[in-house]
C-alpha cells in the first residue's frame, strides 16, 4: 500500500463572498469552482441570524460580515506562495463582478481573521440547534448530494417542498461538492410533524433521484436512510448487502437495524422524543425563562460534546 502524502500548504487566504439571496449563492457556486479553490462552504441567513444572538460569535461576525446578506460562500485558496493566493482573491472579485456582484468579497488574509470565520462555520450544527422553541432542524436529508449544475434548481425545489409542509429549512456546509447540510425545521414531539418528516424525506429522495444524485453523500445511511436503499441502489445490490451481512454477522450483533432489514425511519420508538415523551419539571433555582425553561435549554443539545 502506498500513501500519497502531501505537505500542508504554507499559506491560506479566504474570500467571504456575500450574496443578496440564497438562490444566487447556489447558482454562482458552479462558477466559483472554476478558480480551483480548496473549499467553498455555505453559511446561510438563518445561521447568521442565530449566530448574531450568541455572545461568542457577535464580535467575530462584525469583523467579516457586511450588511445583511442572504447567504455567504467562504472560498479558500491554499498554496506555497502568498502572492499567488492574493492573485486568486483578485480573480475571485473579478469573477463575481462578471456575474453582477460588485464589492461582494471580504478578504481574509490574516490567519487570525480566517480562524474567526471558520469558527462560525465549524460551529454550524451547534448554532442551528440553538433555535429556540420546540421546532428544531431535524436530520433526515442532511447530506444529499447533486451535481453543481443542478444545485440551484435542487435547493429551490427543496425550499418549495418545505413551504408545502408549512416549514423552512436550514442550510450550510460543502457547496463546492454539491453536498449541503440541509435540515427541515420540525417539532418531533408532535405526531403531525413526525408524518411530515417521512413525507419530506420521501419526496426529497425522489427529487435527488431525478438529478442522479446521492441520498447519502457524506454522513452515512443508518437508521434514517437504510429503508430507502432499494430506491437508490436497486434490488440486486440490496440483496448483496443482505448476503454479506449473513456471512459476517449471522446473528446480527453488529449495528442491527441498519443497512440490512432496517426499521422504518419514522418509527417514533427510535426518536429522541418518543410518543410518551414528557419534559421533566425541574426546579433549577436559576432563571431559564429566556430559553423557555430549563427543559427547553436541555433540548437544544445535539449530543456532539462541543461545549
Regions found by a protein language model. Give the residues of each.
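Noncatalytic alpha-helical scaffold of FAD-dependent oxidoreductases
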Residues: 1-173, 178-217, 222-307
